[in-house]
Swiss-Prot record:
It comes from Enterobacteria phage P21 (Bacteriophage 21). This is Spanin, inner membrane subunit. It is a single-pass type II membrane protein. One of its GO terms (cellular component) is membrane. The coiled coil region is probably involved in host membrane fusion leading to lysis. Keywords: Coiled coil, Cytolysis, Disulfide bond, Host cell inner membrane, Host cell lysis by virus, Host cell membrane, Host membrane, Membrane, Signal-anchor, Transmembrane, Transmembrane helix, Viral release from host cell. Residues 25-153 are periplasmic.
Length: 153
């Protein structure tokens, strides 16, 4: 009977060792998978934060763009209205000018032969074109500066 007991004991010990090895193997796998899960969860959280930040920045940039686009459109409309008013005679464009002197010998005394100083039509158009471009450039510059100050930090 000693021999049978020894064989059974050896088999039980082998089974216990094999089961211990299997349990240890699966425990190591569980620890590895848990570490991978935790790492992926951290990366997912970070990615979600980045996405939220990007979406917030996109909304801010869209609002900033809408604001300056509206200001630019308003400035252009004001410039066009001013141009139309000057062309229709409802408003006057005042620019410092000097009239050329007329020889006194060729004119009668006390008679005003010269018209008031006025810009040529092309110069008037050029003035409004330059004014419009200046306003456009100024609004674009203000928008770009605000974008840089708010978004590029």
């Amino acid at each position: 009977m000693n021999r049978v007991t020894a064989i059974i004991s050896a088999l039980v010990i082998c089974i216990i060792v094999c089961l211990s090895w299997a349990v240890n193997h699966y425990r190591d796998n569980a620890i590895t998978y848990k570490a991978q899960r935790d790492k992926n969860a951290r990366e997912l959280t970070l990615a979600n934060r980045v996405i939220t930040d990007i979406q917030m920045r996109q909304r801010d940039v869209a609002a900033l763009d809408a604001k300056y686009t509206k200001e630019l459109a308003d400035a252009k409309a004001e410039n066009d209205a001013l141009r139309d008013d000057v062309a229709a005679g409802r408003r006057r464009l005042h620019i410092k000018a000097v009239c050329q002197s007329v020889r006194e010998a060729t004119t009668a005394s006390g008679v005003d032969n010269a018209a008031s100083p006025r810009l040529a039509d092309t110069a008037e158009r050029d003035y409004f074109t330059l004014r419009e471009r200046l306003i456009t450039m100024q609004k674009q510059l203000e928008g770009t500066q605000k974008y840089i100050n708010e978004q590029c930090r």
